[in-house]
Amino acid sequence: MADLSAFPITRKWPAKDPSVIQLYSLPTPNGQKASIALEELGLAYEAHRVGLDDANVKSPEFLSLNPNNKIPAIIDPDGPDGQPIGLFESGAILIYLAEKTGRLLGETPADRYHAIQWVMWQMGGLGPMLGQLGFFVKFAGAEIEDPRPRERYINEAKRLLKVLDTSLEGRDWIIGEFSIADIAICPWLNGLAFYEALDLVGWGDLKNVPAYLERFYNRPAAERGRNIPPM
């Protein structure tokens, strides 16, 4: 039995089975990336619900694993050289899980870098921009009278969606075959409906992206992972 006592987070969220991957998350777009990857890869894991309130993500126990106080985070009891490893940042988790299993990074070294390229695109562009769009359209930012922030993020969302739409021409998945890049991208696309922003970003004018998103959530693992741990 693995010993996870060196990880203080396990005091607040005890592991029932310390021999499997411990996931600390919530089914937000970033949280879904981790749970869907685990489901797609068929890895044994245990999901712990971490609320976004300060009592959870800013607790000493959670900060001991992720000092950036964001979900998701994981502990893998069977990390490099057989030693436990804790990780945060959803993109890093995706790359780690793919490399651990030798899956979802394409067939060739070039595929691997193309997949990582699109993960970085999501991490640096699509996720942050759509998150800000949601803030200024649905949440507290919607109360700001100055229209410029809202317009900026709507326009940037449109630009990024056009980049994706063009890049999907003639292919089902962003690097040609299903990969962690698709797992990184699609949960954020799905968030546009929650933000009530589909019309604002011209969703109906996109040629390839809507079918791409539908194809993604038609995968059984994606459907399972989209609500783990349950809200």
Regions inferred by a protein language model and the residue ranges of each:
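GST-like fold's C-terminal all-alpha helical module
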Residues: 118-218
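GST-like domain detector, emphasizing the conserved glutathione-binding G-site
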Residues: 1-151, 174
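Residue-level detector of family-conserved "landmark" positions at structurally sensitive sites
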Residues: 48, 226-227
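Short, solvent-exposed turn/loop segments enriched in Gly/Ser/Thr/Pro and often Arg
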Residues: 51, 180, 229
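Phosphate-coordinating loops and pocket residues in cytosolic domains that bind phosphorylated ligands
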Residues: 64, 218, 227
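Active-site-flanking alpha-helical
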Residues: 98, 188-189, 226
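Carbohydrate-binding/catalytic loop surfaces
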Residues: 139, 230-231
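Residue-level recognition of oxygen-bearing side chains
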Residues: 92, 208, 221
